[in-house]
């Protein structure tokens, strides 16, 4: 639940939080089918953010993407379970795709909600078998290639080169981007050129995966019974003898320099991946792709030059997440937000990290991102569709007006305030009107939020941008 102190410290995030809570509530659909009920319930447990993101998709794409996501999380659970010996894990990864059509197959492994996912995996299979043959084949092929790629890296104690690091991220995330693009095109909601530009979707996936690898350093290095080491020696070897050395506060300077090097490496995928945005046409698909990219860049901005990565968890506040989520509703809003985040990263580079050995290369990538965003914002397509800013939205203006009126009505009813102005209290009648106004204000606030959550611009999955 959102912490009250955080909300009070950031009042501008209150409305986005309420909107996000409303969307989360809507995402908890009641499905009579046991398989669908399990899949969407499990999706809520393993990734609340993706559960909301998936609701942006057109109806015909939600089930395939939901099932695809859970299948890959199950595959990832096998890879991440360090209690499984390699002689068991490797064959499981290489043959995982063969069990997609087996209604009886399940496995005991993982932790937390993933134990339930693996033990009740036949319910996922039930839904998978209802998908179109085309979607089934895309998912099966992607799972086969990913499982074999994961298996190739299991026998290695560490990732040695940046090229190996790129390959691993391609297997576990880049392939997903390409497969999802194929599902979008096969649905008829996107054009063939989205699949033709396979490297763009691959880079979007690699960017998000590298963001997770960077953020999860401490969790991975402390994994029992053996650490998971995805940072490539080619990078960290320049700053330490062992990857685990970065946990020692005495090595903070070297650790942060290595961290900045890793962030810089991830940014090169961000530059390339941006080129996929102009190809997306369906507004629901667009939002489902844009929101994770924004969250990824914000996470990198928080991690950059931040020693907290080696001490604990670095993540966005719930309110900030909600604010970013609700601010992305079309290409223009995406580029505006992305440019702002790139500007924040540039400021960190030129300020607190100005002496970093990699800062020139970091800035080169940041400037590339800024250039792409500015070019897109000045394009004829987006200028023609620029519309009003969020603060000019009638619903927002009404919301602010209600808030101001309610506040001053309340303040004026306070004895001290009335006394200063020589106004006599009207007793219970005024108290009653005050309560009525408060109730009406809250009701109108909820109506405004509900209306905004149903605006075609934000939720129409079938309209075209």
Swiss-Prot record:
Family annotation (NCBIfam families): squal_synth (TIGR01559)
Entry GO CC: endoplasmic reticulum membrane
Q: Where along the chain is NADP(+) bound?
A: 48, 73, 215, 315, 317
Q: Which GO terms describe its biological process?
A: farnesyl diphosphate metabolic process; lipid biosynthetic process
Query: Which organism is the protein's source?
Result: Botryococcus braunii (Green alga)
User: Which principal EC class is assigned to this enzyme?
Assistant: oxidoreductase
Family of the protein in this entry: Belongs to the phytoene/squalene synthase family.
Membrane topology of this protein: Multi-pass membrane protein
- As recorded in UniProt, coiled-coil segments are none
Q: What is its EC number?
A: 1.3.1.96
Identify this protein by name. Answer: Botryococcus squalene synthase
- Record lineage: Eukaryota, Viridiplantae, Chlorophyta, core chlorophytes, Trebouxiophyceae
The task this protein performs is described as: Produces squalene when coexpressed with SSL-1 and bisfarnesyl ether and a very small amount of squalene when incubated alone in the presence of NADPH.
Q: Name one Pfam family in it.
A: SQS_PSY
Question: Where would you say this protein principally sits, based on its record?
Answer: membrane
What reaction(s) does this enzyme catalyze? presqualene diphosphate + NADPH + H(+) = squalene + diphosphate + NADP(+)
Task: Note whether Metal-binding occurs among the keywords.
Answer: yes
Q: Where does Mg(2+) bind?
A: 76, 79-80
Alphabetized Gene3D superfamilies for the sequence = Farnesyl Diphosphate Synthase
Q: Where in the cell is it found?
A: Membrane
Presence of keyword tRNA processing: no
Q: State the SUPFAM superfamilies in the record.
A: Terpenoid synthases (SSF48576)
Q: What keywords would UniProt list here?
A: Magnesium, Membrane, Metal-binding, NADP, Oxidoreductase, Transmembrane, Transmembrane helix
Gene Ontology MF terms in the entry: metal ion binding; oxidoreductase activity; squalene synthase [NAD(P)H] activity
Q: Where is the signal peptide?
A: none
């Amino acid at each position: 639940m959102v912490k009250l102190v955080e909300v009070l410290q950031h009042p501008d995030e209150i409305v986005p939080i309420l909107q996000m809570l409303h969307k989360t509530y809507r995402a908890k659909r009641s499905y009579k089918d046991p398989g669908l009920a399990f899949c969407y319930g499990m999706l809520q447990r393993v990734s609340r953010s993706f559960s909301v993101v998936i609701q942006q998709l057109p109806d015909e794409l939600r089930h395939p993407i939901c099932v695809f996501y859970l299948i890959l999380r199950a595959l990832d659970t096998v890879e991440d379970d360090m209690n499984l010996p390699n002689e068991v894990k490797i064959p499981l990864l290489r043959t995982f795709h063969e069990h997609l059509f087996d209604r009886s197959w399940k496995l005991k492994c993982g932790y937390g909600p993933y134990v339930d996912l693996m033990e009740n995996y036949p319910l996922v299979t039930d839904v998978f078998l209802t998908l179109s043959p085309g979607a089934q084949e895309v998912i099966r092929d992607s799972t086969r290639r990913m499982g074999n790629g994961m298996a190739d890296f299991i026998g290695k104690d560490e990732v040695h080169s940046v090229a190996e690091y790129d390959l691993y991220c391609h297997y576990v995330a880049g392939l997903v981007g390409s497969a999802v693009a194929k599902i979008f095109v096969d649905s008829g909601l996107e054009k063939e050129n989205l699949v033709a530009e396979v490297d763009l979707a691959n880079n979007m996936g690699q960017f998000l995966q590298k963001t997770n690898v960077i953020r999860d350093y401490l969790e991975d290095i402390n994994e029992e019974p053996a650490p998971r080491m995805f940072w490539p020696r080619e990078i960290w070897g320049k700053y330490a003898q062992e990857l685990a050395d970065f946990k020692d506060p005495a090595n903070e300077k070297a650790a942060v320099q290595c961290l900045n090097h890793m962030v810089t490496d991830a940014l090169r995928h961000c530059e390339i991946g941006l080129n996929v945005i102009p190809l997306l046409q369906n507004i629901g698909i667009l939002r489902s792709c844009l929101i994770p990219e924004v969250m990824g860049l914000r996470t990198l901005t928080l991690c950059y030059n931040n020693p907290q990565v080696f001490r604990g968890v670095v993540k966005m506040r719930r309110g900030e997440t909600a604010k970013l989520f609700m601010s992305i509703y079309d290409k223009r809003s995406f580029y505006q937000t992305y440019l702002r985040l790139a500007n924040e990263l540039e400021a960190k580079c030129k300020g607190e990290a100005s002496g970093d050995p990699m800062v020139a290369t970091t800035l080169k990538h940041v400037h590339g991102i800024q250039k792409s965003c500015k070019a897109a914002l000045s394009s004829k397509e987006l200028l023609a569709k620029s519309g009003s800013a969020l603060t000019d939205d009638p619903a927002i203006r009404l919301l602010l007006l209600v808030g101001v009126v309610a506040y001053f009505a309340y303040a004026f009813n306070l004895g001290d305030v009335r006394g200063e102005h020589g106004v006599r209290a009207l007793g219970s009648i005024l108290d009653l009107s005050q309560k009525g106004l408060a109730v009406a204000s809250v009701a109108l606030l909820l109506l405004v939020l509900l209306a905004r959550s149903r605006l075609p611009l934000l939720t129409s999955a079938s309209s075209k941008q």
